[in-house]
Amino acid sequence: MAKAKFERTKPHVNIGTIGHVDHGKTSLTAAITIILAKTGGAKATAYDQIDAAPEEKERGITISTAHVEYETQNRHYAHVDCPGHADYVKNMITGAAQMDGAILVVSAADGPMPQTREHILLAKQVGVPAMVVFLNKVDMVDDPDLLELVEMEVRELLSKYGFPGNEIPIIKGSALQALEGKPEGEKAINELMNAVDSYIPQPIRATDKPFLMPIEDVFSISGRGTVVTGRVESGIIKVGEEIEIVGLKNTQKTTCTGVEMFRKLLDEGQSGDNVGILLRGTKREEVERGQVLAKPGSIKPHDKFEAEVYVLSKEEGGRHTPFTNDYRPQFYFRTTDVTGTIKLPSDKQMVMPGDNATFSVELIKPIAMQEGLKFSIREGGRTVGAGIVTKINN
C-alpha cells in the first residue's frame, strides 16, 4: 500500500496531556480524537488503543508514549500521551516528544495532586512555553463553590512555578461525558480545542532560528581547504556568510565558502540537512568534533550550568548504586563527551538510580550551550542519565 502524502496545509503544533495519575489524561486524549473525528479532523482512537502505548527508545532510555494526530480548523496537531508517571518524567527531560504546549488535566473531584505539581515544575524546567487546563470530571462535583476553589488552587500552583496562572484558560468538562456522546461533554472538548488553538503560541520554525550546526567530522581537501560535516540543527547557512566556531577552544570567526550535500554544491543548507561546509582559511587542526558552527554572536561557550536530570534505573541499564556529590561522569552534548563534576544541592546527600534530580555541573571544557540544551550522562560508554540545561551559571 502506498503511503499517503502528508499534506502540510495548516501550521503544525506538538502538544501533550500532562497531570496526575487517573485524572483522565488518556480519556481526554481519546475524547479529543472522537469529537474531532465527527468533522473529519481526526481518526477516532479508543481509550485502550492509546493506553497500550508502544515503547520507544530515546538516547538509550525506554519510554512508553502514545501518539495521535488531529486537526482543528486552524492547525494540525501531534499529541503525545504517556501511560505512567515515570514515562512523563523521562519524556520531558529527554525531549523524546517535543512539546510546544501542554494540556494540564486536573480532576475536579481531587484538585491538584503531587504529580500535578511535578509536571508543572518539569514543564517549566524543560521550557514548555504555554499550557491550557482541562478541569476534568466536573460531573462528579455538585458544589459550584468547590469547582471555584479547585480552579483557584490550580491558578495559584501555575503562578508559583512561573506560568501566568491568572490568564491561563481553564476549561471545565468531563472526558467521560464526551466519550459517551453527551452534548455537554462534546461542548467542553470543542471549547478546549478553541483555547488550545488560540492560547498556545505557534512555535518558531527551526529554519527561522539562528544558524547552528554541530560538527561531526573534519576533512582536509587539498586545494580547497577544510570541510566540516554535520546535520544543520537550526537556521540557514548561505555561501559567503560569516560564521563562528564555538566550544572546546577559543571562539574563532570564519566564512562559509561552500555548502555540499549528496556530492552536489548548494547555495545554502537549512535545518535538517546533512551537509559539508567549506571553511575559508581554517586549518584542519583548528576545528574538531564537538564544536558547533553558528551565526556570529548567537551562542556562547559555557562550562557551568544547572540541570534537570533523569537517572536510569538498574533495570534500564543504569547504575546499580546511587551517586553522591563530586561524582565525575562524562556529559555527552550533541556530538561529544566532556568530563564534568556534579554538585548536589545542600539538602541532597545522594541520587538514586530511577530518580529525577536537579543539580549543578562544572565541565572541564566549555561547550556551546543555551538553556534547553539536552545531554546524556555516560559512564564507561553506557548511558546512565539524561538531562536538560535549565540555567547557565557563568
UniProtKB/Swiss-Prot annotation:
Start and end residues of each stretch annotated as G1? 19-26
Q: Has UniProt tagged this entry with the keyword tRNA processing?
A: no
Q: Where does GTP bind?
A: 19-26, 81-85, 136-139
**A Pfam family hit:** GTP_EFTU
For this protein, the record's Gene3D superfamilies field holds:
P-loop containing nucleotide triphosphate hydrolases (3.40.50.300), Translation factors (2.40.30.10)
Q: Which GO terms describe its molecular function?
A: GTP binding; GTPase activity; guanosine tetraphosphate binding; translation elongation factor activity
**Which reactions appear under catalytic activity for this entry?**
GTP + H2O = GDP + phosphate + H(+)
> Which residues are involved in binding Mg(2+)?
26
Q: Where is this region: G4?
A: 136-139
The protein's matches in CDD domains, at most eight in alphabetical order, are given as: EF_Tu, EFTU_II, EFTU_III
- Give the tr-type G domain ranges: 10-204
Region spans: G2? 60-64
Q: What is the protein's quaternary organization?
A: Monomer.
HAMAP family, per database record: EF_Tu_B
Q: Which PANTHER family match?
A: ELONGATION FACTOR TU, MITOCHONDRIAL, ELONGATION FACTOR TU-RELATED
Q: What is this protein called?
A: Elongation factor Tu
Q: What organism is this sequence from?
A: Rickettsia prowazekii (strain Madrid E)
Q: List the gene name.
A: tuf
